């Protein structure tokens, strides 16, 4: 599956040196309220694509498509979100399909905010139970459907347990703009 991931240059150097890249927990950006959402995603990955390697707790993230388009990311837009001048690398990668879990980027934010996630407006529940809410979160994996509730151009993210050096097709170097 053709994907694109943006990594810090230091992470890319680790990939080149060791032959693989895994998420380093000390660099993750989800302390506090977001951790339960990420832990839920990890559980879903285990169910849907299999167990991670023993040394892996959290996934590597990439893009499958951005705003409805399957193509290389436009780095004029995607080089923000960190300290200005930080070296980053846009990797074009080909990960085996059975090792990737796709999810809807916009819907993911409902999960991050601990909300109920209906696919259709008619399915919205005013005060869902915890079980109803958690079950609704599985809608984040419905990346191929169009609904009246989610009509924006789809941005689809990909998660997988590790990135192997041999999956890298192209590496392009950039600097964060701020």
Q: Where are these predicted regions, by residue range?
A:
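Conserved NAD+-utilizing ADP-ribose enzyme module
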Residues: 1-2, 9-31, 56-58, 67-178
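Membrane-interacting alpha-helical segments
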Residues: 18-50
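Short, well-structured hydrophobic secondary-structure segments
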Residues: 38-71
């Amino acid at each position: 599956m053709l994907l694109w991931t943006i990594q810090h240059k230091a992470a890319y150097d680790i990939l080149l040196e060791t032959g693989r890249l895994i998420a380093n927990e000390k660099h993750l950006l989800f302390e506090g309220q977001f951790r339960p959402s990420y832990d839920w995603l990890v559980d879903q990955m285990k169910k849907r694509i299999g167990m991670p390697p023993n040394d892996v707790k959290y996934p590597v993230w990439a893009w499958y498509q951005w705003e409805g388009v399957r193509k290389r990311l436009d780095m004029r837009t995607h080089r923000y979100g960190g300290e200005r001048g930080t070296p980053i690398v846009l990797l074009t990668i080909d990960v085996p399909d059975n090792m990737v879990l796709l999810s809807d980027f916009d819907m993911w934010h409902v999960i991050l905010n601990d909300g109920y996630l209906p696919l259709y407006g008619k399915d919205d529940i005013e005060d869902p139970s915890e079980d109803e809410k958690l079950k609704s979160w599985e809608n984040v994996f419905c990346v191929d459907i169009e609904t009246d509730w989610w009509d924006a151009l789809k941005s689809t993210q990909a998660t997988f347990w590790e990135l192997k050096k041999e999956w890298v097709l192209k590496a392009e170097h950039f600097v964060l703009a701020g």
